[in-house]
């Protein structure tokens, strides 16, 4: 396909147009009085949401060059979502503000490479300051506040997540399910999560989320490589008769056996998914044994004289539900408390006996996975559209609370970044000069953008509020829900430090990339063939068109 190549200012302006479109559509959702966005779906009902990264993923523009700008800023939202699970709208607003200010300077003749250096140095300084000002989370009240803000000021959700964390511990797993009633409920079950996903994406049952969800499956656990499908045939035939799904957790599954499983899955002969076992060597075997205890099955290992070809249904484990995505697997089992408790006691004993801090840490991880269990939040809503929106908000809230436990909390509502603006200016004036100083000033000017947007979405004058907040103590900010200046921590308006940090770093990274762009190569838009004209009357045509 022929390409279009554009240079210099023209290239940067085209990117900017795409960035403007995406940033505006995402920014309307920011803050307690942010609005919703409706996404048209080719199939099914439209989706009404308030989640920055989901909106960003939906936007595709006709102009390929502008679409490149959209893709760049979408990356800032996606990376923030991957790192912290929340703060995607803030990252988008920050990146947009930095790009706008930066392009003005580049157009005026500033050197983009030196500007980028200034932006990077300013960001590094700010990351240190965010960590300096973060407070560790000490009680479930602070966890509830974090969840409440991330869920769009829903106190019930915040409290529910705090309760879930109390029950499963900081190491435990909190997962979401669609509930059957109108109310959102919390249920804590035994379960385990480990960091290995499906071997092939063809095992996914939900192609939109790229997840495999199997209800009441059999679980085949083995510490050997499965090379030949013949080894599996006897057990597969037994399972096919029951009509239940199967999850295979093995050291590895080689091409021939994997291809056979995938074909059976796609043809609907057997609902199957395969996962590589976590860990290495003896630790892998120990983790597989943990899973066997949890699921009330046996580990099929030649050390115990068991072979795959002789496996029977009573050797397989069972679970209530297994959820597998690209990176993780969550097993929810039930009704095996005695055996799990005995296994936990055994691990605790090993922890007391070992001197190695590394072994202790790994045993602690295993214990948390076995004992922690899984908290399941069953999302309730009146309609499917509301259910999807609630689920996204809850996902953000869970991620935000986990991020808060990791790196602590800072004043929310854009307050932290706004207060860091004059601190950065003072530092930059002393430590940077020339165009690097201009780069730092670009970041400094952008730091108030999230606060201004939150205020504007609440119907206030953003610029005035940002200036007022800068003059107040570090903890004081603007509560957009009530329109008052308050102590943010006391009012429960807090953000996880990790979310603020990730958003800032990803925004600065994307802004630096856009500013240093000098040329864009993109596909030429395809010419649409105009339809052939119909036969005019009196032209002697035999057919009516």
From Swiss-Prot:
<dbReference type="InterPro" id="IPR027410">
    <property type="entry name" value="TCP-1-like_intermed_sf"/>
</dbReference>
<keyword id="KW-0143">Chaperone</keyword>
<dbReference type="InterPro" id="IPR018370">
    <property type="entry name" value="Chaperonin_Cpn60_CS"/>
</dbReference>
<keyword id="KW-0547">Nucleotide-binding</keyword>
<dbReference type="GO" id="GO:0140662">
    <property type="term" value="F:ATP-dependent protein folding chaperone"/>
</dbReference>
<dbReference type="GO" id="GO:0042026">
    <property type="term" value="P:protein refolding"/>
</dbReference>
<keyword id="KW-0963">Cytoplasm</keyword>
<dbReference type="GO" id="GO:0016853">
    <property type="term" value="F:isomerase activity"/>
</dbReference>
<comment type="subunit">
    <text>Forms a cylinder of 14 subunits composed of two heptameric rings stacked back-to-back. Interacts with the co-chaperonin GroES.</text>
</comment>
<feature type="binding site">
    <location>
        <position position="413"/>
    </location>
    <ligand>
        <name>ATP</name>
    </ligand>
</feature>
<dbReference type="InterPro" id="IPR002423">
    <property type="entry name" value="Cpn60/GroEL/TCP-1"/>
</dbReference>
<dbReference type="InterPro" id="IPR027413">
    <property type="entry name" value="GROEL-like_equatorial_sf"/>
</dbReference>
<keyword id="KW-0413">Isomerase</keyword>
<protein>
    <recommendedName>
        <fullName>Chaperonin GroEL 2</fullName>
        <ecNumber>5.6.1.7</ecNumber>
    </recommendedName>
</protein>
<dbReference type="GO" id="GO:0051082">
    <property type="term" value="F:unfolded protein binding"/>
</dbReference>
<dbReference type="InterPro" id="IPR001844">
    <property type="entry name" value="Cpn60/GroEL"/>
</dbReference>
<comment type="function">
    <text>Together with its co-chaperonin GroES, plays an essential role in assisting protein folding. The GroEL-GroES system forms a nano-cage that allows encapsulation of the non-native substrate proteins and provides a physical environment optimized to promote and accelerate protein folding.</text>
</comment>
<dbReference type="GO" id="GO:0005737">
    <property type="term" value="C:cytoplasm"/>
</dbReference>
<feature type="binding site">
    <location>
        <begin position="479"/>
        <end position="481"/>
    </location>
    <ligand>
        <name>ATP</name>
    </ligand>
</feature>
<dbReference type="GO" id="GO:0005524">
    <property type="term" value="F:ATP binding"/>
</dbReference>
<dbReference type="Pfam" id="PF00118">
    <property type="entry name" value="Cpn60_TCP1"/>
</dbReference>
<feature type="binding site">
    <location>
        <begin position="29"/>
        <end position="32"/>
    </location>
    <ligand>
        <name>ATP</name>
    </ligand>
</feature>
<dbReference type="InterPro" id="IPR027409">
    <property type="entry name" value="GroEL-like_apical_dom_sf"/>
</dbReference>
<feature type="binding site">
    <location>
        <begin position="86"/>
        <end position="90"/>
    </location>
    <ligand>
        <name>ATP</name>
    </ligand>
</feature>
<keyword id="KW-0067">ATP-binding</keyword>
<comment type="similarity">
    <text>Belongs to the chaperonin (HSP60) family.</text>
</comment>
<feature type="binding site">
    <location>
        <position position="495"/>
    </location>
    <ligand>
        <name>ATP</name>
    </ligand>
</feature>
